Amino acid sequence: MAMVQPKSQKWRLLATHLLMFTFIAMILFPLLMVITISLRPGNFATGSLIPENISWEHWKLALGYSVVSPDGRVTPPPFPVMLWLWNSVKVAFITAVGIVTLSTTCAYAFARMHFRGKSTLLKGMLIFQMFPAVLSLVALYALFDRLGEYVPFIGLNTHGGVIFAYLGGIALHVWTIKGYFETIDGSLEEAAALDGATPWQAFRMVLLPLSVPILAVVFILSFIGVITEVPVASLLLRDVNNYTLAVGMQQYLNPQNYLWGDFAAAAVLSALPITIVFLVAQRWLVSGLTAGGVKG
């Protein structure tokens, strides 16, 4: 026997689908516009959503190849986009690994150990994290200018300095991982201790394998945050060859010459590392959500 839905429920279902499709369109439209601009001849930001003529000149320049026009004029790549992309991936990956490592060990101490001032430290970390990084730019510049005199590889205009600056923003990740650790039954580590495991072995062989989903989330959030970060990187990096892609892309928007097509191609390239990392870590994210739903 077929079920008959009330008319009011049908309208609610229709409204839900309309809102969902509208939301998806709002997300996809800017992406389609950027892709269209990258495939449109010339460096124009306006035009039809579907280009009449498709040109690969902007993609060739972004990938480091020269473009030869019909009149024989050779246009070399204006900027080292692929080098910037490599710098972004390198800095983001090292930073994300460092953040996961530091956050995990700190979160373990706060979740499993008892010491004086723990609550004050946790609250203090959270309060300091609430202040935007822009407020500390002057202090960061002075700090890394002085550090560079003693330790050159973490001074100004170095990727080490940028990574070191990013590693300071772990407070929210510590809170996130700490909360996840507290949902794991401590009796598992106690059982490992009865079998002769040291606290470090229990942490490494019991707690960490059970925490892979949240570690994947922290890694992805850290990776995306570094890939898209501009203020700190633009302050500390001076040499064009040391730029990350997010910083270097500003060179396309010179007031005398806006290279919108080249900018759009570089913007699409900047999304590739984020997409790849998300696809690789997707199974851990899904398993984490599923496990959370089962455990309640």
UniProtKB/Swiss-Prot annotation:
| Entry-linked PROSITE patterns | ABC_TM1
Q: What single Pfam family name could you report for this chain, choosing any that match? A: BPD_transp_1
Q: Name one GO cellular component term.
A: plasma membrane
Keywords attached to this Swiss-Prot or TrEMBL record, sorted alphabetically, are: Cell inner membrane, Cell membrane, Membrane, Sugar transport, Transmembrane, Transmembrane helix, Transport
What region holds the ABC transmembrane type-1 domain? 85-281
Where is the chain membrane-spanning? 13-35, 89-111, 124-143, 153-175, 206-228, 258-280
Q: Which domain of life is it from?
A: Bacteria
Periplasmic-facing ranges = 36-88, 144-152, 229-257
Question: What role does this protein play?
Answer: Part of the ABC transporter complex MalEFGK involved in maltose/maltodextrin import. Probably responsible for the translocation of the substrate across the membrane.
Question: What subunit structure does UniProt give?
Answer: The complex is composed of two ATP-binding proteins (MalK), two transmembrane proteins (MalG and MalF) and a solute-binding protein (MalE).
Know the name of this protein?
Maltose/maltodextrin transport system permease protein MalG
